[in-house]
Amino acid sequence: MAKFIMAQYKDNLLGEANSFLEVLEQVSRLAPLDKPVLVIGERGTGKELIANRLHYLSARWQGPFISLNCAALNDNLLDSELFGHEAGAFTGASKRHPGRFERADGGTLFLDELATAPMLVQEKLLRVIEYGELERVGGSQPLQVNVRLVCATNADLPRMVEEGHFRADLLDRLAFDVVQLPPLRERQSDIMLLANQFAIQMCRELGLPLFPGFSERATATLLGYRWPGNIRELKNVVERSVYRHGDSEHELDAIILNPFRQTAASVPEAASGDELPALPLDLRDFQLQQETRLLQRSLQQAKYHQKQAAELLGLTYHQLRALLKKHQL
């Protein structure tokens, strides 16, 4: 049963990059332990998927998995939604409302964007972690709950502690172990693996018999883009591009990075032609992106013969190998 449930998440947890495989290994070690876990990662890196994996590989897998985005609610609503409220606790509270902790009893509660939680909620979270008890808003009777807490953020929580915006004692309790998710730009070897998987899934959704594959130009575009939205953005871009490509038997050539443009370009603006990118920009990121594209182009032109690719770039073989390792190519 657990393997069946995990199947719905595995497609977005594909990867061969060492940094990603190390995360999966860490999660497998953490899952059986009944301890809080903190997941750190940029938007779109799959923080909730990791929380799901922690749940379904644990002894709690038959219990509920409940999630809540703390940034989606104001302070009062977040308090009520997490811990529940009694009838008459506030205007409009006509009946008792069980909170997410009660609903997650015996299972796992995943809290995304934890850094946005106000101090009052942080104090209550600490009490649940330490004593396994809470009080509904407007109530006076303590309730016992048995919940594993997995929290996620992209904020610098230690710095927030120093600035007085996050409780040091709560961070200590949450950070039994910290899972750091690498951004997609640091998983170059996984981009095409994921892109092909998303393309095949989209073809099935559209009722298309097969996916004809990506052209060299499309591949260069996918590998050369920085993916600020990470896996979520890659999935959206690939699905959009497959949809626009339709049932053509030719390789997919046009990658639609920006659907708001009248004419969809198949290469990022900063990477097309000899035009300079718009300012302001992050020069270091731009240089890394251009270096990556040149490495990819030399490999393609040399048909992935690394000594020939090194000659095309005026490098020694060992210099090329060092750059390929640097860019995870």
Protein language model regions, located:
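AAA+/SF3 P-loop NTPase mechanochemical coupling elements
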Residues: 66, 96-106, 110, 118-124, ...
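Nucleotide-binding/hydrolysis machinery
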Residues: 1-21, 29-32, 36, 58-63, ...
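Bacterial C-terminal helix-turn-helix
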Residues: 37, 46, 52, 236, ...
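Small-residue (primarily alanine) positions within well-ordered alpha-helices
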Residues: 31, 51, 104, 151-152, ...
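Short gly/ser/thr-rich secondary-structure transition/capping motifs
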Residues: 88-95, 131-136, 159, 276-277
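Conserved post-Walker A coupling segment in P-loop NTPases
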Residues: 12, 25-91, 102-118, 146, ...
